[in-house]
């Protein structure tokens, strides 16, 4: 609920011309690297010596951070506004606060999994008008699980994220049954079953007569090719 309260406080207080160009970021040059902040220790209140000692994540924490970065960036790229990416976050760069967050771009050590993920997020957002100009509609929020829609005159897209350690059945309505899914989880009987830390994105397109068209894979635009 607090997530939607925060988002709606922005949506309801900015005109569309400003809302759709707001900078959405999860990391900047003034903060610890996003992957470090998500999976590592909180550097607030610690000096540079401590931050230097804790600057590199363990292998298990780094793997966890990659997963958490995917979840965070999926939300970042599908909320109203423009996703703003701090250089290197898409490559898996880690580091505590300044100066540890300002290392050179790792041209020879890019995290291929995360880099590919960000490329697809960019393609999806650029190819789907609902993410660029669509109305934001909250759908569900409970126990670290959220679902929301972005709706334009051309299409409607639903984003559902389970950021908990429990399997959750998210009520979204039977109108999403048989919709096109970019991830494994689908709507069945009006519910999306999400495994722990799973997410999904469903899409449907509107017909000229006001109905909905659930496009098969071969007729989907490039932005809706499965990741």
Task: Please state what every model-predicted region is.
Residues 1-217, 221-223, 227:
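Active-site and adjacent substrate-binding regions of carbohydrate-active enzymes
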């Amino acid at each position: 609920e607090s997530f939607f309260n925060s988002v709606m406080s922005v949506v309801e207080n900015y005109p569309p011309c400003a809302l759709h160009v707001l900078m959405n970021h999860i990391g900047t040059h003034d903060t610890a690297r996003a992957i470090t902040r998500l999976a590592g220790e909180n550097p607030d209140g610690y000096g540079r010596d401590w931050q230097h000692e804790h600057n590199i994540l363990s292998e298990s924490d780094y793997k966890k951070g990659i997963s958490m970065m995917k979840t965070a960036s999926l939300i970042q790229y599908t909320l109203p506004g423009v996703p703003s990416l701090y250089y290197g976050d898409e490559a898996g760069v880690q580091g505590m606060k300044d100066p540890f967050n300002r290392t050179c771009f790792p041209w020879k050590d890019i995290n291929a999994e995360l880099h590919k993920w960000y490329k697809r997020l960019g393609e999806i957002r650029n190819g789907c008008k609902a993410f660029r100009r669509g109305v934001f509609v909250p759908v569900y929020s409970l126990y670290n699980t959220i679902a929301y829609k972005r709706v334009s005159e051309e299409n409607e897209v639903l984003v559902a994220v389970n950021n908990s350690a429990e399997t959750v059945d998210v009520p979204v309505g039977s109108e999403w049954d048989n919709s096109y899914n970019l991830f494994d989880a689908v709507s069945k009987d009006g519910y999306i079953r999400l495994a722990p830390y799973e997410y999904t994105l469903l899409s449907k397109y509107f017909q000229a007569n006001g109905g909905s068209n659930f496009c098969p894979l071969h007729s989907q635009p490039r932005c809706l090719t499965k990741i």
